[in-house]
Swiss-Prot record:
GO terms for biological process: rRNA processing. Gene3D superfamilies: Metalloproteases ('zincins'), catalytic domain. It is found in: Cytoplasm. Belongs to the endoribonuclease YbeY family. It comes from Aromatoleum aromaticum (strain DSM 19018 / LMG 30748 / EbN1) (Azoarcus sp. (strain EbN1)). Its cofactor is Zn(2+). The lineage of its organism: Bacteria, Pseudomonadati, Pseudomonadota, Betaproteobacteria, Rhodocyclales. GO terms for molecular function: metalloendopeptidase activity; RNA endonuclease activity; zinc ion binding. Binds 1 zinc ion. InterPro entries: MetalPrtase_cat_dom_sf_prd, YbeY, YbeY_CS. Single strand-specific metallo-endoribonuclease involved in late-stage 70S ribosome quality control and in maturation of the 3' terminus of the 16S rRNA. GO terms for cellular component: cytoplasm. This is Endoribonuclease YbeY. Its EC number is 3.1.-.-.
Length: 154
């Protein structure tokens, strides 16, 4: 599914790919929700793909691009940071579902958090240093609050 969405301050060309089986498909958010979450965190214009994957693909990508041999919740790939940002977010549905259950969070809220988190990474935010982490977490919390979701760090 691909669609252009425009807000007063941002234009988003979004493709959502679902490389997952029926069980994970049932647990994954709709394209409309993904678009809503991405736009809420976007400052400027972007062309991006959100790819929802299973554990095997998530593990392979994390190993190949980060040198870590396990599936992680979200991976961010930035391709262009000019006037129109271009990049991909890859979310591993079984990992996101497992984390939500382990942390006692609603699955939808956890997906929203990870899309917002990934969108901030696409725009250059990071959390390696403590001051960067604080800034990024504050932004995530603010964006999620505007969407009606609780603070993911509380």
């Amino acid at each position: 599914m691909s669609a252009d969405t425009e807000t007063a301050s941002s234009r988003l060309a979004l493709t959502v790919q679902r490389a997952i089986g029926a069980e994970n498909r049932a647990r994954s958010p709709t394209s409309a929700l993904i678009r809503r979450w991405a736009l809420a965190a976007l400052r400027g214009d972007a062309e991006m793909t959100v790819r929802l994957v299973g554990e095997a693909e998530g593990r392979r990508l994390n190993r190949d691009y980060r040198g870590k041999d396990y599936a992680t919740n979200v991976l961010t790939f930035v391709y262009d940071e000019s006037e129109r940002l271009a990049g991909d977010l890859v979310l591993c549905v079984p990992v996101v579902a497992r984390e939500a259950a382990e942390q006692g969070k609603p699955l939808e809220a956890h997906f929203a958090h990870l899309i917002v988190h990934g969108m901030l990474h696409l725009q250059g935010f990071d959390h390696e240093a403590p001051d960067e982490a604080e800034e990024m977490e504050t932004l995530e919390t603010r964006v999620l609050a505007t969407l009606g979701y609780p603070n993911p760090y509380a």
